[in-house]
Amino acid sequence: MKSLKELYKIGRGPSSSHTIGPERVAYYAVETFGKGDYTAELFGSLALTGKGHGTDRVLKEVLGENTKIIFDARAKELKHPNTLKLYKTENGENVLVCTAQSVGGGSVVINGKPYPDTPDVYPQKNFAAVRKFIEENNLSLPDYVKFYEPDVFFYLKNVWNAMKESVERGLRKDGVLPGALRLERKAKTLYFAEAKFETSVMRENRKLASYAFAVAEENADNGIIVTAPTCGAAGILPAVLYYMYRDNNVPEEEILNALAAAGVVGNVVKQNASISGAECGCQAEVGVACSMAAAALSSIFCLDSDGVECSAEIALEHNLGLTCDPVLGLVQIPCIERNAVAAIEAVNAVTLSKSLKNKRKISFDNVVKVMYETGKDMNTRYRETSTGGLASLYGSDADK
């Protein structure tokens, strides 16, 4: 498995696969072939939702404002639903310089090879192998990360700072998010919206939800966030960590350890399945983020490896089949609210795990396998194409 630096990327929203990934491809082209007149041809989900996700905007920012963008949404066989081709004009002709796939979380494959093509850091390939190693060596998941990648904790400090800042920025802001939905920011309102007869549990859930709203709204507004594991699901892990840090006085060192534990879970999914909504639906984004947040909270509570696995498994299992159907191709409805719901789900998964970990029958690795199979079976209308689900019904009489 790769470095946690390849999982947690600090960048701009609204979409890791549709903005951060294509931006990487564009920088590769400029660094390799130089500046000039480029044409970008987008296929699959990039063509269908690229406009709403800002793919054309980031490509023009890197390649030049005169870059021609072609959205080819025709159905065709693709190696990955997020495929793009870049052409450079040479002697009056368009010459193909690269074919790339944005495979999720801002990671890209260019001309058949991962870019950058970094070596594996962690030799284990699944959670069972990770568990075997840490139990044989009496380690925790954060210890496991320290064993193979000790220097990454300096990077995780930057990741945590970026997460924390995105929560705090989002809580301060009012106004309307960009795009035709004209969606109002709700994080600040939610944070202060104490209701009559509100129970202590409801109050804590509301605060937790407001933190997730804050980050997800920053993401939708092209703000700086962290892929965890993606931009579309970027509010879930920061919400849980910020809640423990600010409202429960968990020290920063434990937050960084929790980030490491969550990163291992995210890496296992990335290695064995997908974190791309265009490939496997929202279960691969929000579902995996929920699982990562549950693992992080389990680490803070010092649960053993069985407890961590049980928490992560519960969180992912109950997001199986979750569709990706962004309205108008924007990372707003249902994405923002879904981040908040998943943050609460992550806490509930840990609550269940504390009591049920010794009685479970399903492994995390098997849930990951099922998630991938489910995603592959899912109709393309529900895989980030905005042609099915909520995206296809928005604006009907029922929504008026």
Model-derived features with residue positions:
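Accessory "access/gating" subregions that flank catalytic or transport cores
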Residues: 164-249, 253-267, 274-277, 281, ...
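Contiguous, well-ordered alpha-helical segments that form the cores/surfaces of helical PPI scaffolds
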Residues: 210, 214, 235-245, 260-268, ...
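Short beta-alpha connecting loops at secondary-structure transitions
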Residues: 9-11, 276-281, 326-335
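Functionally critical mobile loop/hinge segments
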Residues: 297-400
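Alpha-helical support elements that line or immediately flank enzyme active sites
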Residues: 19-31, 238-249, 294-302
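Non-transmembrane, aqueous-exposed alpha-helical and coiled segments at domain scale
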Residues: 1-9, 23-46, 52-53, 63, ...
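Conserved phosphate/anionic-ligand binding catalytic regions in large, soluble enzymes, centered on
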Residues: 8-28, 221-240, 282-290
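C-terminal regulatory domains involved in ligand/effector binding and gene-expression control
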Residues: 65-197, 207
